[in-house]
Amino acid sequence: MTLASIRRGYHVIKTLLQYGLDDVLPPKMTPWYFKLARNSLFWIRNKHKGKSGGERLKLAMQELGPVYIKLGQMLSTRRDLLSDEWANELAMLQDKVPPFDGALARQAIEAELKAPIESYFDDFDETPLASASISQVHTATLKSNGKAVVLKVLRPNVETKIQADLLLMSQTAKVIDYLLGEGNRLRPSEVIEDYRVTILGELNLKLEALNAIKLRNNFLDSDALYIPYVYEEFCYPRLMVMERIYGIPVSDIAALKAQGTNFKLLAERGVELFFTQVFRDNFFHADMHPGNIFISREHPENPYYIGLDCGIMGTLSEVDKRYLAENFLAFFNRDYHRIAQLYIESGWVSEKTDLQAFEQAIKVVCEPMFNKPLDEISFGHVLLELFRTARHFDIVVQPQLVLLEKTLLYIEGLGRQLYPQLDLWQTAKPFLEQWMAEQVGPKAMFKKVSTKLPYWSDKLPEFPELIYDNLKLGRKLLSSQQQMLDKYLKYQQQAHKSNYLLITSAILLICGTLLFNQDATLWSPYVCLISGAVLWIIGWRSRPKNRKF
């Protein structure tokens, strides 16, 4: 461990203690040696006693900087782990940090381009358009066609800083795991590993560019979503160049109202976009917070979304998609037995789970939701409550479903902010039912066969040879099995013969010994002893030597 990491560790501990976060730890996490260590840092006192635990955690993460802010944002979506009070506080964390020097940004961009900025761009503005914890954005125009673009560049040394903080988080999580023991609900190491994968993915702008290109291609003909054009020739691991857009932030409700935006259509399109990305394309934007979404300025009566920042994307397996769709349909049909079955069939919970107990737990959680009108029931909260319940039955955490749950909560919250009367179920139900109809029945079977047809057509000429080889292999196996059986029978015969001779020899030897003490003829004990010895030698030599069949 380096001196810098020790210094950073002390700063983290000091900050957490100054916000009194040691006071909110459960008893399991405060054994005598923890209390001894805490008392040894007597000069660090809680300076925020009047604030709630959730607010103190939010302020501490804000003070610790970008990596912890992003961790807090991620934790705010893990409502299966945290209480609503804590999750709501963490959701208020903002990824806003002071910009770094524009001259440093120029150097970083030129290092990636391996040429002066002026070789490819005009009007480069060293004052950033936006600044975040991992990167910042500068404007320019393309020299080749004069189009306005933005250049997104990583902060200097951000990878090193993030790796150092991740290592510290990982070590701390292992300690907490140890203190909480087996079966703890929080599972810190698991949470930090999910976070590590997510944040390291955001450090590669080339990957983000490829994600944006794929999402753009999926919605090229859509009137609901627009993804800015990415100039792939200028994209590198630390630099990304894309078309500049001029939209209205989705959170600016006043500006959207002023231009006469059709809020009902906009909210319904948001829901449709989510289900289209998940079920049609199996590639969904998993960071749909308001800072990444804009609304078009033109055609307010027929508005569309503009999506930015494709650093975090999610995918589901075909199995996950089917079980997810069936879960939603089963919930709205109040079929709790089927929901429990689906969780077990999908492998999300162990097959050893008590089905009846699991079904009853789901019913207890979900049934009260139907006291509300259908248009007030939240898909995201349904999924969240099911995950929370499944955690008591040892759910195997699925990172892709955590991303999906987070995205669904964002989309729902956004939809109801834009149009409070949004009936999510009525918007989504036809989509889910149509998708399920495409997955089962004659049409689905024909589609699957059609998809596999080119593969089987390619393999068809090999079938005769394959059948012949299998028959030949079968004959070899039968022959081999017959040989093994013959060897086994021979072994048994030899073993029986040997055992018979050895037992007979033992009887003769015992008889010979006894005859010495009786009034027997002179020769009879010797005959028994000699015969017994001879039979023992023959029996011993006739034992089967090889037990391999």
Curated annotation (Swiss-Prot):
Molecular function per GO: ATP binding; protein kinase activity
Keyword Magnesium attached: no
Main location (coarse class): membrane
InterPro entries: ABC1_dom, Kinase-like_dom_sf, UbiB, UbiB_bact, UbiB_kinase
Active-site residues per Swiss-Prot or TrEMBL entry: D287
Enzyme Commission code: 2.7.-.-
Positions of ATP binding: L129, A130, S131, A132, S133, I134, S135, Q136, V137, K152
A GO CC annotation given for this chain: plasma membrane
Domain Protein kinase: 123-501
Lineage: superkingdom: Bacteria
Subcellular locations according to the entry: Cell inner membrane
Membrane-crossing residue ranges in chain numbering: 498-518, 520-540
SUPFAM superfamilies hit by this protein: Protein kinase-like (PK-like) (SSF56112)
Key word Protein biosynthesis present: no
Family of this protein: Belongs to the ABC1 family. UbiB subfamily.
Protein name stated in the entry: Probable protein kinase UbiB
Organism taxonomic ancestry: Bacteria, Pseudomonadati, Pseudomonadota, Gammaproteobacteria, Alteromonadales
